[in-house]
Amino acid sequence: MLSEIIRGTKTTLPANAKGQRMWYSYRYEPVMNMYVSRIDDAFGYSSEAGNFVYRYGMALRRTDLNRLNYETDLDNLGRIKAVRGPNELATGVPYVIAFDYQPKATFGTNGITAPGYAVTKHYDMQHPSDDMETVTFVDGFGRPVQVKKDGVVTTAVKGSAPKDETVMIVSGRNVYDAFGRVAKAYYPVTEAVGSKTTFNKAFDNVSPTVTVYDVLNRAMKVTLPDNAETKTEYSTDAGSNALVTTVTDALGNRQATCTDGSGKTVKTEQLSGPDGIITTSFEYDGIDRLVKVTDTEGNVTTSVYDMGDRRTEVNPPASGITTFTYDALGNVLTKQTANLKKEGKTINYEYDYGRLTAINYPDHPENNVKYHYGGINSSYNRIGRLMLREDGSGAIEYYYGKMGEVLKTVRTLIVPNQAVATYVTQWKYDSHNRLLEMIFTPMRRK
């Protein structure tokens, strides 16, 4: 795919079937002329970035297509200190996510006694005075060695009611071998709230997951706490020189995967099937495109590609040849199955630049699908997003929140010779995309 770049400020893509050429125009900040401060496109959409910290090359304020703002705070080392989204900026909340870095470790005669850590705070709109906190500890190699998270554990003793307890959930300890590989991994433990920044040295009482490696750092055997074992063997196929990886799970099921020197899978074998070995082989062309798949019964599926690396034909044994045509932009224009070819018909696709707007079927045009998108003056945060979809069953309209989440859908179903039924469903999310509320409105008939 070719594109035009004009003085580094405008990129124009190839034309689609309508002759439309998508373009993006870039405007740079006036001080250093290095960082993009505004992007416009052929749809009329625009996004902006501003308040640059040139020392670190980062923008502290960004505006999306729906003209909603996002802010970032940095510390003196260029690390992100706090992030605010549209919800927080509208309500005056200081952050949705904040970070506190404490990278300095405490050393004793036997090494690190207190590792460095960082605290991540997630603002919780349901509990404004109680952030959800995550503490990550790292060792001298920069490896995360422990993670603590806020949590609630429900316990119940026989004969008593369940009890909720607020705790810190501590990730399981890892034991490393001399080569820095995880040899033992323990289950998580819990601790009382109040010592979140203190490394927890406790090991869970349950046996750990034990991993044994070969000299090439490949896992050879993994033993779970219940003594279930997964074994992996590595060998070379004598005929093709492919790497053969044979995995045996705890139930004795065995599967072999053959990969070539480029890491592509050329053959898989189910070695423990009830009807014998089940083999699937794969063939590629000179530029690593999958062109042939042969199953264990000798059935062959082939694929053909054009010079633009687009698949133009797929021929599975069950359904026959399916062909595709494309425009210069790479949009699929037509699809023709073996049955449609007999009648000289195709499924046709329409686009607005690179955006799908319609699917037209050769038979039963009432099943055609249309897509409508929000323009530059759309409301409900629908600029640049799918606004309405129409198909044979009716239509569905979308309403969005400030973070791009779907807040409401209006589903209209057309029942032939009966009535038009409308269903309205609404959702409410916080800034972490957690569902807080769902409202379902009963059907309304017209």
Describe each region flagged by the PLM.
Residues 1-446:
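Acidic, low-complexity segments
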